């Protein structure tokens, strides 16, 4: 059972950070999470493999369901009014991004987002770094939020000092509530979540795979 697998792993490999152990449809095989990746384990804790489990009778990818289930949030939890909205083309694809202006991976992501077509991007400014808080508020209070954000994160150009009522504290509370411990965090329209910088091709592949 699940407890047996957990104890065997803990006893033999105490430094292995495995979580969310579950039974699968295949007797003696268990799914789990390791570094945000779905893995499979034998009950004795001696074997582990990574890959897709396919149910042959209907060709259903059971691993895909696990990935979605364990890496998703409810899109309706996102207060879109607290994000900077950028629309490109017809805006049919939708993406939310939690981003810190001083995060190097967020800076890597921005040029990739620029390559996307027909997309609506909601940028939640999420200053995990203390030095990012003031400038995050200034971006929100700028006359053109989207332009100011791009200038800051891509070129390091800080906006003119401004103050106004802003959602930065709410964004921090929301991110912590949702368990967002790193940036950038990307959320797709069905709630599927990815952490870290991704290429435009990777984002487009997710849209295609999930029918978004």
Regions found by a protein language model. Give the residues of each.
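Short strand-coil-strand connectors
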Residues: 35, 189-190
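Short secondary-structure capping/turn micro-motifs that flank functional sites
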Residues: 130, 191-192
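Extracytoplasmic thiol/disulfide redox context detector
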Residues: 1-137, 151-154, 158-183, 199-212
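Conserved, helical-rich catalytic subdomain that frames metal- and/or nucleotide-binding sites
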Residues: 143-150
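Short, solvent-exposed loop/turn motifs
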Residues: 38, 192-193
């Amino acid at each position: 059972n699940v407890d047996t697998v957990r104890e065997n792993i803990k006893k033999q490999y105490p430094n292995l950070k495995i979580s969310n152990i579950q039974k699968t449809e295949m007797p003696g095989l268990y799914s789990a999470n390791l570094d945000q990746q779905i893995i499979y384990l034998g009950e004795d804790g001696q074997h582990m493999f990574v890959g897709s489990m396919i149910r042959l009778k209907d060709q259903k990818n059971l691993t895909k369901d696990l990935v979605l289930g364990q890496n998703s949030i409810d899109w309706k939890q996102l207060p879109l009014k607290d994000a900077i909205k950028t629309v490109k083309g017809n805006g049919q694809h939708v993406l939310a991004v939690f981003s810190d202006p001083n995060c190097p991976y967020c800076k890597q992501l921005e040029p990739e987002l620029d390559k996307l077509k027909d997309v609506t991007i909601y940028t939640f400014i999420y200053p995990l770094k203390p030095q990012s808080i003031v400038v995050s508020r200034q971006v929100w209070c700028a006359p053109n939020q989207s332009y100011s954000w791009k200038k800051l994160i891509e070129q390091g150009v800080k906006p003119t000092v401004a103050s106004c009522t802003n959602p930065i504290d709410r964004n921090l509370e929301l991110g912590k509530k949702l368990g967002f411990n790193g940036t950038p965090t990307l959320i797709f329209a069905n709630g599927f979540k990815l952490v870290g910088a991704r290429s435009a091709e990777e984002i487009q592949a997710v849209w295609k795979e999930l029918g978004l």
